[in-house]
């Protein structure tokens, strides 16, 4: 039941968030399990940032954690109080990327959100099982490239996050492109939605 001024629930894969809000992955050390767990408990989607997670968990626990172990532990804590929780993993993390993905999936992460580059190989790292895979894009061209690559791996995005030039983080825009009318969210959205519909009709999150 929704009122005129409320957002409908957000359904991704087999999960439904009663509050249509995804708390962003803010690194380093902001989006950790306490924040993600609190958001998930209230009905939104809580997100842990994987940036420097091994060092942060090692410092907090006093026990050495590698990248895989840190993702496994932090996601487990984020999910401990119920609700929907996942992780944001940047492609730019390089060698830590795949270990973060594996740890998150093994911990039962509800979602993996991935940007900071094109996550072309994400579905091939490990069978996601119940974990929803969600790329971050800033253009229809980027999403089309991801969809075609993922389909060759036997997968389609479960949703996509569209970030415009005013978003924080690692954006796909050059400085001179930031003020272009064509890059306003309201102009990017229809193009992204068209690609989504062409590849199965997954949700577009702005």
Question: Predicted regions span which residues?
Answer:
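Glycine-rich beta-strand-to-loop/alpha-helix junction loops that act as flexible
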Residues: 203-206
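Active-site entrance/lid segments in N-terminal catalytic domains of soluble metabolic enzymes
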Residues: 2-200
């Amino acid at each position: 039941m929704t009122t005129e001024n409320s957002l409908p629930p957000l359904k991704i894969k087999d999960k439904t968030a009663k509050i249509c809000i995804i708390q962003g992955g803010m690194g380093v050390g902001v989006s950790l399990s306490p924040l993600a767990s609190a958001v998930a408990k209230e009905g939104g989607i809580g997100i842990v940032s994987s940036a420097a997670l091994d060092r942060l968990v090692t410092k907090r626990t006093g026990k050495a954690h590698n990248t895989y172990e840190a993702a496994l532990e932090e996601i487990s804590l984020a999910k401990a109080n119920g609700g929907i929780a996942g992780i944001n993993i940047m492609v730019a993390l390089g060698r830590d990327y795949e270990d973060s993905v594996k740890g998150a999936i093994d911990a039962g992460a509800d979602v993996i959100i991935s940007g900071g580059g094109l996550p072309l190989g994400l579905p091939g790292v490990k069978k996601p099982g119940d974990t929803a895979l969600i790329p971050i894009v800033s253009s229809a061209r980027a999403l089309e490239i991801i969809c075609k690559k993922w389909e060759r791996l036997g997968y389609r995005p479960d949703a996509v996050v569209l970030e415009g030039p005013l978003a924080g983080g690692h954006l796909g825009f050059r400085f001179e492109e930031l003020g272009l009318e064509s890059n306003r969210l309201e102009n990017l959205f229809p193009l992204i939605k068209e690609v989504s519909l062409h590849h199965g009709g997954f949700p577009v999150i702005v």
